[in-house]
Amino acid sequence: MASLQTQMISFYLIFLSILLTTIFFFKVNSTETTSFSITKFSPDQKNLIFQGDGYTTKGKLTLTKAVKSTVGRALYSTPIHIWDRDTGNVANFVTSFTFVIDAPSSYNVADGFTFFIAPVDTKPQTGGGYLGVFNSKEYDKTSQTVAVEFDTFYNAAWDPSNKERHIGIDVNSIKSVNTKSWNLQNGERANVVIAFNAATNVLTVTLTYPNSLEEENVTSYTLNEVVPLKDVVPEWVRIGFSATTGAEFAAHEVHSWSFHSELGGTSSSKQAADA
C-alpha cells in the first residue's frame, strides 16, 4: 500500500513538473497581439472613447473644428499590453494613419495634433500649446506619456529656436526630445507611419504627402529617437489622438487608422479588422 502511495505521489510530481514546464514553455514562446484597422469612421464608432470635442462624422474622426480654444481627443477603447512585468518583454508595434489639418489661413494655424501612449485612465490635459496631452515643459515622470506631435504653432518656452513647424517626439514633457522641421501643407492629407522596435528601443516616425502639388517643397519626413518605453509608460496603456486650438485655430481630422502590436512571452490575442 505504501509503495502504491509512493508511486502515486511520484506520478503526480512528474505530472505537475511536466504541466509547469509546458505552461512556462507556452508563456515564453507565445505572442500576444493586438490589431485593428479603421478605414472609415462610423457615426457610432464603438471601439473609440471620445474626450473633449472629439467626434466622428462623414467617415472621419474630427478632433477639433476650426474654432478657438478647443481640445479634442479619441482613444482606442481596449487597453494595450505594451510590456510584460513577468518577462520584462516589450512589444513591437506599428501604427499608421492619415490626417488633415485644415485652417482658414495657412499662415495662422494652431496648435497641433498628436498620437500618444498614456496610462489607461488618461484624461485631457492642458490645451493650447500643450496639445491636450501634457501640463508642463518640465520632465514629469508621473505623466507616463509618450507622444508624437505635429506642431503648427511656435511656443518660445519649449519649441525649437528656429520657430518652424515641426514633428516632435515627446517623453513625459511637451518639450520634445527630438524634432524635425515640417512644412505643413494646409488641407492636404498626410500619411503617417510610427513604428517601435523593442530590440533597439528606437521609435521611428515617417510622414508623407502623397498627393502634394508643391513640387519644390519637401514632402517626406523621417524622425528617429531611442525611447525606453518600459521605463516611461505603464505595463497597460491606451493609445489615441489629441488636437488643440488656441487664439489661432484649424480643423484636425483623422481619416483612417490601423495598429498592430506583438508582445512575446504572453498568451492572448485581440484582433478587430475594419472595426
Swiss-Prot record:
Signal peptide extent: 1-30
Pfam families: Lectin_legB (PF00139)
Keyword Manganese: yes
Any GO MF annotation of the entry: D-mannose binding
Propeptide intervals in chain numbering: 211-217, 270-275
Gene3D superfamilies per the UniProt record, alphabetical: 2.60.120.200
Amino acids binding Ca(2+): 151, 153, 155, 159
Post-translational modification summary for this protein: The mature form consists of two chains, alpha and beta, produced by cleavage of the immature protein. These remain cleaved, yet fold together to form one subunit.
Domain of life from the UniProt record: Eukaryota
Binding, Mn(2+): 149, 151, 159, 166
Keywords assigned: Calcium, Lectin, Manganese, Mannose-binding, Metal-binding, Signal
SUPFAM superfamilies recorded: Concanavalin A-like lectins/glucanases
Ligand binding (D-glucose): 111, 129, 246-247
Additional information: Binds two manganese (or other transition metal) ions and two calcium ions per heterotetramer. The metal ions are essential for the saccharide-binding activity.
PANTHER family: CONCANAVALIN A-LIKE LECTIN FAMILY PROTEIN, LECTIN
Family: Belongs to the leguminous lectin family.
Subunit composition and interactions: Heterotetramer of two alpha and two beta chains.
Identification of the protein by name: Lectin
Record organism: Lens culinaris subsp. culinaris (Cultivated lentil)
